[in-house]
């Protein structure tokens, strides 16, 4: 499949923010676009369900203001990644024998205004460059086997849906391919992948991102999966007070969860998937109990952040009791 205007739109992407301008802070701007109906490259994998840390449900909860967005800008891995990025770009340019430009802009897609992009680099011959740094043994093994992790493929193809920007000598043309450069060791060259763009993948990705943004707009949560991320987020969905009888579909998930629970070491994700399905359905129906199947239960917990704040303000230990809050409901299978 060749790139089409239904994927790329017409013309160069619009510059939303120029991070070289004084007073324009990348982290502050990025946080703004983490809310509402926008999808950035690093969020594409969550939409597709291949992000190992953030599920589609969690991303939906965060974008709709139902769940806090963790600030990872000060995490060591993120800081080191930012520091090493220009070094890895330089190494990659030397390995490929081409000049790589680092555009310091946030772009908006001309046809799909929910898609934003911030490119790590663009080669002089029109290839998209993405840089990663990691010490993950699993990813190192994939690099050695010539495999690209699915979450990175999603991010790369999100960016590939944009045309080359206005400052490039080939402005307005589709990207000619992509380069993924992965640094896993300070004393070794990065793994460099020089690949073609899968335009069918891009087409499917746009469709799924559009559907996801409509879910954010309409307040409709995506189906939870069996990830830890979904298991935490599903507990934050509102639960009502009513009851209902179990349908055949609910009984099927209920039995599958119980079967998986007998051997959680090998079926933990399956167990969470079926349990999360029931929990999300109960939220949708605004009930707290499915007779003979499941019910919710709440407990009190200590909000440590609030406790620290109160103690710092008043230096009064008895305020501990004021810092207790009701936890999100636990789902109990019967």
PLM segments and residue spans:
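Accessory terminal regions of nucleic-acid processing enzymes
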Residues: 1-334
């Amino acid at each position: 499949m060749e790139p089409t205007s239904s994927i790329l739109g017409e013309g160069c992407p619009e510059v939303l923010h120029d991070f070289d301008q004084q007073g324009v802070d990348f982290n502050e701007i990025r946080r703004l676009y983490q809310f509402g109906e926008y999808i950035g490259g690093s969020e594409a994998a969550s939409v597709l369900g291949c992000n190992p840390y953030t599920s589609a449900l969690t991303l939906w909860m965060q974008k709709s203001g139902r769940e806090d967005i963790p600030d990872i800008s000060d995490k060591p891995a993120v800081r080191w990644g930012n520091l090493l990025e220009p070094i890895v770009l330089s190494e990659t340019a030397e390995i490929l024998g081409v000049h790589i430009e680092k555009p310091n802009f946030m772009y908006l897609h001309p046809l799909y205004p929910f898609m934003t992009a911030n490119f790590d680099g663009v080669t002089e011959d029109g290839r998209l460059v993405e840089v990663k740094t990691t010490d993950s043994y699993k990813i190192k093994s994939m690099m050695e086997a010539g495999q690209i992790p699915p979450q990175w493929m999603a991010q790369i193809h999100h960016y590939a849906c944009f045309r080359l920007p206005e400052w490039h000598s080939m402005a307005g043309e589709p990207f000619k391919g992509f380069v993924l450069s992965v640094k896993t060791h300070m004393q070794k060259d990065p793994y460099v992948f020089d690949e073609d763009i899968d335009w069918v993948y891009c087409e499917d990705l746009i469709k799924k991102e559009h559907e996801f943004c409509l879910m954010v707009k309409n307040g409709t949560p995506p189906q939870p999966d069996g990830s830890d991320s979904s298991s935490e987020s599903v507990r934050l969905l509102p639960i009502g007070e009513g009851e209902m009888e179990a349908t055949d579909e609910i009984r099927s998930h209920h039995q599958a969860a119980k079967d998986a629970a007998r051997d959680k070491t090998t079926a933990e994700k399956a167990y969470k998937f079926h349990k999360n399905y029931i929990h999300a359905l109960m939220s949708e129906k605004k009930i707290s109990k499915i007779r003979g199947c499941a019910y919710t239960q709440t407990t009190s917990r200590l909000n440590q952040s609030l406790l620290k704040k109160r103690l710092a303000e008043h230096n009064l230990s008895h305020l501990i009791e004021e810092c207790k809050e009701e936890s999100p409901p636990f789902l109990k299978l019967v």
